[in-house]
A protein has these predicted regions:
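Catalytic alpha-helical scaffold of carbohydrate-active enzymes acting on polysaccharides/glycoconjugates
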Residues: 2-197, 222-245, 251-302
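Positively charged, amphipathic and often flexible ligand-engagement surfaces
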Residues: 186, 198-220, 240
């Protein structure tokens, strides 16, 4: 019987078809800054409140995150630019209209973008089916208007979704979803029409979960990012792996932390066999070269 949820087949990594990245790279590395905007007075949502500490407005928490767009983003860019990193931004689309300077800096660097919703204070799980359809139309149109780019993927706003989300994403023309943090390689996701894959994101190599939620120091973040890379680099000699580092400008962009991002990137980018890329390009390459084989292989196991 299929394992719930019946969206992905179980296929152990030890006997899958081998993946070869471009130029025989061992690791496809993508960096995902979460460039977000939180509403000062968000709509009341009985399922979840973005500011549980006090009644709205919570100036402390709002302004803490706003630091990222005012200061941290720019400090983070300096580090990323030193290593010629081309990012795939997890983007609250409202940023494109609220902060044109940030928009222009990202466009100038030819970054790719995945939707992270409109605001990080609006969640998908309260949406009706038609509201969710309109949400995808809105995010696709907004990105195209401001960057000229076609939206290809999504990390749900605050990693939220509905049971319909994969089907509606594919229906709208999206090809990848990063909410599924279940693998070190892309994996096909079953949808009613089209093709959709999970591209490995990370809650482990994520400054939000480590530095904010669990209060680890920046040197620990650097240490585990380098250790993760070293292990994936070793395994990638046999079959390509994906590594994502998830950043939040209001966290990694703090003065006392930014040196650790330099430490991480210096270590990784000193290696040959690293495909520094974006989630868009990983999804495109995987679907073109490995999607059909992966589906056929999983079918034999089920």
């Amino acid at each position: 019987m299929p394992l719930p949820p019946d969206r992905v087949d179980y296929s152990p990594i030890i006997d899958r078809p081998i993946i070869k990245w471009p130029n025989d790279a061992r690791v496809a590395l993508w960096i995902s800054p979460n460039v977000e905007h939180y509403e000062y007075m968000p709509d009341d949502d009985s399922a979840r409140t973005p500011w549980p500490r006090t009644p709205f407005p919570d100036v402390q928490q709002y302004s803490y995150r706003d630091y990222g767009n005012r200061v941290g983003f720019w400090r983070m860019l300096e580090s990323l630019d030193r290593y010629n990193i081309r990012c795939c931004v997890s983007l609250n689309m409202a940023v494109l209209e609220h902060f044109p300077e940030i928009r222009d800096a990202m466009v100038q660097r030819d970054y790719d973008y995945m939707s992270h919703g409109i605001y990080n204070t609006r969640y998908l799980y309260t949406y009706t089916e038609e509201q969710e359809r309109e949400f995808y139309r809105d995010t696709i149109d907004t990105l195209k208007l401001h960057t000229g780019k076609q939206l290809k993927g999504m990390l749900g706003p605050a990693i939220s979704g509905t049971e319909r989300t994969p089907d509606l994403m594919a229906e709208a023309g999206l090809i990848y979803h990063t909410d599924w943090m279940h693998d070190d390689q892309p994996v096909p996701i079953k949808v009613k029409s089209g093709k959709l894959v999970s591209v490995p994101y990370s809650i482990e190599l994520n400054d939000s979960s480590l530095l904010r939620d669990n209060h680890y120091e920046g040197d620990y973040f650097a240490r585990i990012c380098k250790a993760q890379f070293d292990q994936l680099y070793k395994e990638g000699a046999e079959s390509g792996r994906v590594m994502c580092i998830a950043l939040h400008p209001f966290l990694i962009g703090q003065p006392h932390r930014i040196k650790y991002l330099d430490d991480i990137l210096s270590h990784i980018m000193s290696h040959d066999g690293v495909w520094q890329t974006t989630a868009d390009d990983i999804a495109d390459y995987y679907i073109e070269n490995y999607y059909d084989d992966a589906v056929a292989h999983a079918a034999k196991l089920s």
